[in-house]
C-alpha cells in the first residue's frame, strides 16, 4: 500500500467500527509491510479487541453483528479510546533499531533557527567566552603569559596567528558584508596547520594576513599598560579596594577584546583549573585529617577553617581547646601544617587568596557552561545541514554515518569560529567547514593504504595537468614533461606516480570463466623454482659420482674444504686437526685431488652445470 502505517491503521479501525467486526485476514491485509513480528501483531489485535471491535476468524451471524453494533454505538468513549490506542500503536511502529533513522528522528525534533535566533545564540556564546576571559584576566599569570607570547612574536620565534585570531569590537554591529574570502582564508590556515602535522619539513607559511600588525601592537600595548596600572594599584592599596576593583574591571574589558587561538585559550583556562585542583587536593587532605581521622564534626571544621586568608592560627587554637578531638589534632599537626603551607604557597604564586581563586574558578565554570549550552543549541539546530552535504559524498570510500560524523566535527569548528558581526548567515559559513571536514576525511581515510592529505592534493593536481596535457599533445605525458609543467623535481613526480597507483585485489578474476585469479599469476619469490630444484639435485648427484672416483681421504678433504653436504666450509687448519696432520699436508692432498678432478673424463660431467 502507498499509505503510511498510521493511515493504514486508521483505515482499519474505521472499517472495523463501520461493520462491527474485523477478520484476521482483514487485519493482515491492512497491516504495514514492516510489521512481521508475531508479538507486534498480537499486540495490535489485542488493542483492537480492547476498543470493542472483535477480531474473528470468519464473519459473524447477522444477530451477533446487531448486538455488537449496539454495544459499540452505546460506548461514548470509543472514539477517544481508539485515538489513545492508535497513538500507542503508532509509537510502537515508530520504533526502530536503525541508527541512521534514530539519529534523523531525534534531529527532526529540533527546530530550525532564524537569522535572529542565530545571532541570539552567537551572542550567548560570546557572553560565555567573555565571562571566562574576564575571569582569567584576574589571574595575573594569564596576562603575563600572553604578553610573553607577544614578545616572542616580536623576536620572530612564533607567528602572531599562533596567539590570536583577531580582535572583537564590542560596539561594532555587522560592519562587514558577507564574503567567502574570510572563510577561505580560515580554511586555508586550518588546512596548512594540519599539513604541518603530516610533514614537518614543509616551509613555514605566512598566515597573519587577516591580522593588522599595527592594530595588534596597539592592543597589546594597551593591555600591558592596563596590566601594570592594575598591579600597581593592588600593591599600593588592597585588592578589595574600590580603586583596585575598578582597575581589574578595566583590565578585563581590555583583555576580552582579544580573540585568542583555541590552543592559547585552553592553556590559560587549564592553568587556572589546575590551580584550583591543587587547592582542592590540599583541602581534601586537611578535611580527611581533621574530620575523618580526628573525628572533628564537619560543621565545626567549616566554622573554624579560614576562608579569606589561609593561616595556622585556627588549628593551633582548636588543638588547645578541651574538645574530644583536640588530642587527636596534635597527632596530625605536622601533616596539616604541610597542606596549609602548600595552600599559602599557591596564594603567593597567584597573588590571590584561596577565596579569590575559588571565586574566579566558579565564574569561569559558569561562563564555560553558558557557552557550551549555546554551542550545543547551534550545533543541534544545524545537523540537517550536515546530512544534506554528506549525501553528496557517498560512495567515495566512507560509510554515510562516518561522513555525518566528520561533517559534525566541521560543524562544531564552524560554531567555534563563527562571527555574527560579519553579516553572513551561519549556514553559509558552516557549509565551508562541513565540506572541508568531509573531503579531508575522505582523502585521509578512504584509501586502504593511507596517503597524507597534502600528497593526495599533489596527486589530484598531477592527474588534472596530465589530462590537460593528454588533450594538448595527444598522448600520455612523460615524467619529464610533467616535471617541467608543474615545476616539481622529476624524482618527486615519479614518487607521486608510484604512490597514486590504486591497490589491486589478489582475488581479481582473470578471464571469462572466473576459474583463475590474479594471485595465481604472481611469482612467489620465496619458493625455489622447479628448474633450479632439478638442477641442484642433478649437480648433487654428479658431484657424488665424481668424488666417488677419489680415495676416501681425498674425497673427505674436498667435502670439508668446500662444504659439500655440510653446513659450512672449513679452513686448512680445521681439516688438519680432523686428520691430525699439518695444514701443508692438507693443502697437498687438496691440490692432488683437484688435479684428478680436472681430468677431462671427470671434469666434463661438472662443466655442463656452469652458467654461460
Swiss-Prot record:
Its main location: cytoplasm. One of its GO terms (biological process) is DNA-templated transcription initiation. InterPro entries: RNA_pol_sigma-70_dom, RNA_pol_sigma70, RNA_pol_sigma70_r1_2, RNA_pol_sigma70_r2, RNA_pol_sigma70_r3, RNA_pol_sigma70_r4, RNA_pol_sigma_70_non-ess, RNA_pol_sigma_70_r1_1. Residues 546-599 are annotated as: Sigma-70 factor domain-4. Residues 191-206 have a biased composition (Acidic residues). Residues 572-591 bind DNA. GO terms for molecular function: DNA binding; sigma factor activity. The keyword Ribonucleoprotein does not apply. The keyword Signal does not apply. Keywords: Cytoplasm, DNA-binding, Sigma factor, Transcription, Transcription regulation. GO terms for cellular component: cytoplasm. Residues 191-210 are annotated as: Disordered. Residues 457-533 are annotated as: Sigma-70 factor domain-3. A motif (Interaction with polymerase core subunit RpoC) lies at residues 402-405. It holds the Pfam family Sigma70_r3. Residues 378-448 are annotated as: Sigma-70 factor domain-2. It is found in: Cytoplasm. NCBIfam families: PRK05658.1 (NF004208), RpoD_Cterm (TIGR02393), sigma70-ECF (TIGR02937). Sigma factors are initiation factors that promote the attachment of RNA polymerase to specific initiation sites and are then released. This sigma factor is the primary sigma factor during exponential growth. Belongs to the sigma-70 factor family. RpoD/SigA subfamily. Interacts transiently with the RNA polymerase catalytic core. This is RNA polymerase sigma factor RpoD. It comes from Buchnera aphidicola subsp. Acyrthosiphon pisum (strain APS) (Acyrthosiphon pisum symbiotic bacterium). The lineage of its organism: Bacteria, Pseudomonadati, Pseudomonadota, Gammaproteobacteria, Enterobacterales.
Amino acid at each position: 500500500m502507498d499509505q503510511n502505517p498510521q493511515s493504514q491503521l486508521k483505515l482499519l479501525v474505521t472499517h472495523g467500527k463501520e461493520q462491527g467486526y474485523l477478520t484476521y485476514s482483514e487485519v493482515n491485509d491492512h497491516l504495514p509491510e514492516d510489521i512481521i513480528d508475531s508479538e507486534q501483531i498480537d499486540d495490535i489485535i489485542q488493542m483492537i479487541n480492547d476498543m470493542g471491535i472483535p477480531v474473528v476468524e470468519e464473519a459473524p451471524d447477522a444477530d451477533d453483528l446487531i448486538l455488537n453494533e449496539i454495544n459499540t454505538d452505546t460506548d461514548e468513549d470509543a472514539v477517544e479510546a481508539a485515538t489513545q490506542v492508535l497513538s500507542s500503536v503508532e509509537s510502537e511502529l515508530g520504533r526502530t533499531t536503525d541508527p541512521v533513522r534514530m539519529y534523523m528522528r531525534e534531529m527532526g525534533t529540533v527546530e530550525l533557527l532564524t537569522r535572529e535566533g542565530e545571532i541570539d545564540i552567537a551572542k550567548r556564546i560570546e557572553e560565555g567566552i567573555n565571562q571566562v576571559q574576564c575571569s582569567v584576566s584576574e589571574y595575573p599569570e594569564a596576562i603575563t603569559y600572553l604578553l610573553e607570547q607577544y614578545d616572542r612574536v616580536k623576536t620572530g620565534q612564533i607567528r602572531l596567528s599562533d596567539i590570536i585570531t583577531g580582535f572583537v569590537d564590542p560596539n561594532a554591529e555587522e560592519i562587514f558584508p558577507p564574503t567567502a574570502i574570510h572563510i577561505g582564508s580560515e580554511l586555508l590556515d586550518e588546512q596548512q596547520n594540519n599539513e604541518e602535522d603530516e610533514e614537518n619539513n614543509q616551509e613555514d607559511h605566512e598566515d597573519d594576513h587577516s591580522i593588522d600588525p599595527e592594530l595588534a601592537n596597539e592592543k597589546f600595548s594597551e593591555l600591558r599598560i592596563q596590566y601594570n596600572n592594575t598591579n600597581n594599584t593592588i600593591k599600593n592599596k588592597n585588592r578589595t579596594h574600590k580603586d583596585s576593583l575598578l582597575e581589574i574591571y578595566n583590565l578585563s574589558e581590555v583583555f576580552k577584546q582579544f580573540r585568542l587561538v583555541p590552543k592559547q585559550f585552553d592553556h590559560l583556562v587549564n592553568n587556572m583549573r589546575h590551580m584550583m585542583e591543587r587547592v582542592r587536593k590540599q583541602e581534601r587532605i586537611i578535611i580527611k585529617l581533621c574530620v575523618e581521622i580526628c573525628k572533628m564534626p564537619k560543621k565545626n571544621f567549616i566554622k573554624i577553617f579560614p576562608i579569606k586568608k589561609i593561616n595556622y592560627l585556627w588549628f593551633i587554637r582548636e588543638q588547645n581547646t578541651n574538645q574530644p578531638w583536640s588530642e587527636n589534632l596534635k597527632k596530625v599537626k605536622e601533616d596539616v601544617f604541610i597542606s596549609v603551607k602548600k595552600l599559602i604557597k599557591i596564594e603567593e604564586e597567584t597573588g590571590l587568596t584561596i577565596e579569590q581563586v575559588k571565586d574566579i574558578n566558579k565564574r569561569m565554570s559558569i561562563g564555560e557552561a553558558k557557552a557550551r549550552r549555546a554551542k550545543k543549541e547551534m550545533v543541534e539546530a544545524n545537523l540537517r545541514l550536515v546530512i544534506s552535504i554528506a549525501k553528496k559524498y557517498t560512495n567515495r570510500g566512507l560509510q554515510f554515518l562516518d561522513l555525518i560524523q566528520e561533517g559534525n566535527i566541521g560543524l562544531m569548528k564552524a560554531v567555534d569560529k563563527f562571527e555574527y558581526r560579519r553579516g553572513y548567515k551561519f549556514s553559509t559559513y558552516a557549509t565551508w567547514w562541513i565540506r572541508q571536514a568531509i573531503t579531508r576525511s575522505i582523502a585521509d581515510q578512504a584509501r586502504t593504504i593511507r596517503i597524507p592529505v597534502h600528497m593526495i592534493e599533489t596527486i589530484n593536481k598531477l592527474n588534472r595537468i596530465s589530462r590537460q596535457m593528454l588533450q594538448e599533445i595527444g598522448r600520455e605525458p612523460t615524467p619529464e614533461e610533467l616535471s617541467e609543467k608543474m615545476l616539481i623535481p622529476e624524482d618527486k613526480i615519479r614518487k607521486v606516480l608510484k604512490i597514486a597507483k590504486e591497490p589491486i585485489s589478489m582475488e581479481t578474476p582473470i578471464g571469462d570463466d572466473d576459474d583463475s585469479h590474479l594471485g595465481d599469476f604472481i611469482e612467489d619469490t620465496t619458493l625455489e623454482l622447479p628448474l633450479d630444484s632439478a638442477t641442484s639435485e642433478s649437480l648433487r648427484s654428479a658431484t657424488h659420482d665424481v668424488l666417488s672416483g677419489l680415495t676416501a681421504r681425498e674425497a673427505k678433504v674436498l667435502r670439508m674444504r668446500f662444504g659439500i653436504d655440510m653446513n659450512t666450509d672449513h679452513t686448512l687448519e680445521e681439516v688438519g686437526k680432523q686428520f691430525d696432520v699439518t695444514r701443508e699436508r692438507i693443502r697437498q692432498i687438496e691440490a692432488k685431488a683437484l688435479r684428478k678432478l680436472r681430468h677431462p673424463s671427470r671434469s666434463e660431467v661438472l662443466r655442463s652445470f656452469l652458467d654461460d
